[in-house]
Structure formats: C-alpha cells, structure tokens
Amino acid sequence: MQQKSSSQKLINVGFGNFVVASRVVAIVNPSSSPMRRLREDARQEGRLVDATQGRKTRSIIITDSNHVILSAIQAETVGQRYTQEDAD
C-alpha cells in the first residue's frame, strides 16, 4: 500500500482511488434498504463520492466527515485491506 509523507495510511478502494484509513468509520454492504437510503441522502446533500468507475457498487465506506464513498470492491475485501493497514 502507499503512504503519504505524513505517514497517514491509505486504503485502496479500487481503480487507483484511496481513502485515508484513520477517517473511515464504517465499511458496509450496499444491498440493504437503509444503505440505499443513506446513499440517496448523501447524493442529494452533495456528500457522495462515487469511486466505482461505472461498475456495480459492492461496498459503501462512511467517513468521519459524514461523506459516503461508493466502491466496486467487496466490503469484505476493503475490510481486510483496512485491517492490514491497522496492523502495519
């Protein structure tokens, strides 16, 4: 994984997109109704970041700034990458 010079850990969320690991609050599966509402609310409020490159959304990442990031990578995979970054 790549690191910034300030030693903040980054998580690869697919297609060359990264999220600062310390800002992540939750990594969730997008299939439930509450997660669909969360995504729609974030879109309407301008807090949605779509990192899917036009592919199917497979995970939703919620940050401490209340931004919602859509990823085409499975939630389990993103979670494993997050855990690996915590271990380093």
Curated annotation (Swiss-Prot):
Q: Which InterPro entries match?
A: RemA-like
Pfam (any one): RemA-like
Q: Which residues form the signal peptide?
A: none
Question: Which superkingdom is the protein from?
Answer: Bacteria
Matching entries from PANTHER family are given as: REGULATORY PROTEIN SSL2874-RELATED, REGULATORY PROTEIN TM_1690-RELATED
HAMAP family in alphabetical order: RemA
Concerning its family, UniProt says: Belongs to the RemA family.
Protein name, entry field: Putative regulatory protein DvMF_1139
